[in-house]
Structure formats: structure tokens, C-alpha cells
């Protein structure tokens, strides 16, 4: 009788079914709509990421190595993307995936495949973007004050960033006299007079 109970117990469907545990990957936390808007505001470029404080950095991995070439920190994503394009062309050649493939022939080329030369060429490309951005942000129509007889020195002087600052030294001479008057004048102590 005991055997029949054991057999019945073993043959019962509750005991014969295996308990299978499926691996379920952890779900990513659902982002709020506000977070998605913030993420989608800045462009995504290959080899470019944004720091928490708003600066953009660019780096590229050296082929067949785990190390990376640091290309720099930039104020805009476009500058960092152009720096990455220069490095990608230098390292991978024509098979490189570029952020701006239409501008490949305008980009500076490094003197060699040395990381220092690649960094220098990347910095030059980023600086060219900064110059292009300055030209675009300036007035689109030519300035009426600049004439053909203006010398290049006068144009450079008018474009000087410091020319827009207020004259901070205007009243310095008037205030300096009052500054020295606030100190009491005393004769120096000489030990020989005693």
C-alpha cells in the first residue's frame, strides 16, 4: 500500500511539472516626457558626448587597441564632431564613418598618424568651426562704415572684442587722490633722535 501511495505521489501532475524560470532582463526606468525633450534637444554625433556642465568632449578609439585618443573639450557639439571626423579620417581612411561626410575634403589632415598630430589637426578643425560660427553670427549685411580705403588694421581694431567694453578707467585719476588722503601721514621713527 505504501508503494501505491508513493507511485501515485510521483505520478501526480503537480510534482512532475518542472519549474522553469525565464531570464527577464531588467527594464529601463521609464523616462518622463521632460527628460526625453532634454535628451532630444542636442544632436547626437559619433565620438561626441556632453559633460554634465554643458561642454562637449570628443575622443576616438585607436584600432586594435583599447586606448583612446583624447581630441579635446569643445563649446559646441559641431566643433567636437569635426574634430572626431579629422581623427577618423586619419585613423581609418576612406572607410571612416563621418559626422559630416560632405565636408571631408575641407578638413585639415594630420602630418602623421601620431596621436599628437591627430590632436593638433582635430583642434585646427574645431577652431575652423568656431571661426565659421563667428562669421555666421555677425551681421549678414556688410557694414556701411567699412569702406575700400579702410586699412586692415582699422578693420581689426573695430572687430576687437574689447572695443565693446565700457571705459572702466574714466574716473581713475579723480579717485586715486582721495584714496591716498585716507591714510594718516606720520614721520618715520628714527632711533638716533633719542
Curated annotation (Swiss-Prot):
Example GO molecular function: transcription cis-regulatory region binding
Localization of this protein: Nucleus
GO cellular component entries: nucleus
Matching Gene3D superfamilies: AP2/ERF domain
Swiss-Prot/TrEMBL keywords: Activator, DNA-binding, Ethylene signaling pathway, Nucleus, Transcription, Transcription regulation
The keyword Nucleus is annotated on this UniProt entry: yes
UniProt xrefs under Pfam families: AP2
Segments for region (Disordered): 1-40
A biological-process GO annotation: ethylene-activated signaling pathway
Cited function: Probably acts as a transcriptional activator. Binds to the GCC-box pathogenesis-related promoter element. May be involved in the regulation of gene expression by stress factors and by components of stress signal transduction pathways.
Name the record gives this protein: Ethylene-responsive transcription factor ERF038
Organism this protein belongs to: Arabidopsis thaliana
Gene: ERF038
Amino acid at each position: 500500500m505504501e508503494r501505491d501511495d508513493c507511485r501515485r505521489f510521483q505520478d501526480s501532475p503537480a510534482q512532475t511539472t518542472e519549474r522553469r524560470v525565464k531570464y527577464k532582463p531588467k527594464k529601463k526606468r521609464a523616462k518622463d516626457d521632460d527628460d526625453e525633450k532634454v535628451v532630444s534637444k542636442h544632436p547626437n554625433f559619433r565620438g561626441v558626448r556632453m559633460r554634465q556642465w554643458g561642454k562637449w568632449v570628443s575622443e576616438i578609439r585607436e584600432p586594435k587597441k583599447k586606448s583612446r585618443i583624447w581630441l579635446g573639450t569643445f563649446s559646441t557639439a559641431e566643433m567636437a564632431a569635426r574634430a572626431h571626423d579629422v581623427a577618423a579620417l586619419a585613423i581609418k581612411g576612406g572607410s571612416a564613418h563621418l559626422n559630416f561626410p560632405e565636408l571631408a575634403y575641407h578638413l585639415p589632415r594630420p602630418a602623421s598618424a601620431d596621436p599628437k598630430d591627430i590632436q593638433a589637426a582635430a583642434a585646427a578643425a574645431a577652431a575652423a568651426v568656431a571661426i565659421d560660427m563667428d562669421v555666421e553670427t555677425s551681421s549678414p549685411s556688410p557694414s556701411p562704415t567699412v569702406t575700400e580705403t579702410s586699412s586692415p588694421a582699422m578693420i581689426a581694431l573695430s572687430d576687437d572684442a574689447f572695443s565693446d567694453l565700457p571705459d572702466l578707467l574714466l574716473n581713475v585719476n579723480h579717485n586715486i587722490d582721495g584714496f591716498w588722503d585716507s591714510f594718516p601721514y606720520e614721520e618715520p621713527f628714527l632711533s638716533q633722535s633719542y
